[in-house]
Amino acid sequence: MSTPRIKAAIIGSGNIGTDLMIKIMRTSRHLEMGAMVGIDPKSDGLARAARLNVPVTHEGIEGLRRLPNYAEIGVVFDATSAKAHLTNNALLQKDGKKVIDLTPAAVGPFTIPAINGDANLEEPNVNMVTCGGQATIPMVYAVKRAVKRLVYGEIVASISSKSAGPGTRANIDEFTETTSKAIEVLGGAERGKAVIILNPAEPPLIMRDTVFTLSQGGDREAIEASILEMAETVKTYVPGYRLKQKVQFEVIGDNAPVRIPGIGTASGLKTTILLEVEGAAHYLPAYAGNLDIMTSAALVTADRWAARRLAKEAA
């Protein structure tokens, strides 16, 4: 007897959507592909989906709603843009679909599996922050849980230019705004800042991330232990996630405090964390760790939701 699965649709046939489709077909425990949706009839993602016998449409959200199997689809991943998501989500909520938002729209609550895994599973829409956020905010949170006060968190995400499709490029401002907010909401920093760099180097370089925090009332050994534990947690769903170098510390004394917008001058312990994310190469090569961490986090979240729903239906 085959294991019951919930049908999933993906809106957005670009790099992220195509990588996610392959992950669902190869690794998902509780989902199966029900549709791939795009707006470019010549996109590689739609062509691949068609070759894999996945129902496709190049007519966007309205095309999805017209597909014969639309009623069977239980969860929809939106990998379009922040602006498009607002329209898509309104229609999907009206139709009673579970929505996993891979855009920076942040309509639903921020979700990072390593931090608040199951907390928002019953929400109709959950937001996966950004690729940079998925990679770095677990580290901000790791520092937060080991200190009394996390004054500041700043992340710099460097991704290969080749891995950034038109959707990513159109959402740069939303990326920084959403990631900065999530550093505060999920990471626990009083003030957050995010920077993204599209690296044009050839051959393409692997995703690299730097995390800076300023904390007070913490022990270096406890902070480092928390960081190492968090790295192992993320690695359970993103095997290519790792610390690039040993955690670095620097004391910022009262005699030379830093100025933080919205807070003022502050001193404490500066922690620097250097990360590397190697992709699983399901679609783009291994340098595209930014795709891998985003789609892996989304799939883990959806699989957990699906497992809960299937268990309820079987009860």
From Swiss-Prot:
Gene3D superfamilies: Dihydrodipicolinate Reductase, domain 2 (3.30.360.10), NAD(P)-binding Rossmann-like Domain (3.40.50.720). The keyword NAD applies. NAD(+) binds at residues 13-16, 163-171, 290. Keywords: Aromatic hydrocarbons catabolism, NAD, Oxidoreductase. SUPFAM superfamilies: Glyceraldehyde-3-phosphate dehydrogenase-like, C-terminal domain, NAD(P)-binding Rossmann-fold domains. It holds the Pfam family AcetDehyd-dimer. It is an enzyme of class 1 (oxidoreductase). It catalyses: acetaldehyde + NAD(+) + CoA = acetyl-CoA + NADH + H(+). CDD domains: ALDH_C (cd23933). GO terms for molecular function: acetaldehyde dehydrogenase (acetylating) activity; NAD binding. Its EC number is 1.2.1.10. This is Acetaldehyde dehydrogenase.
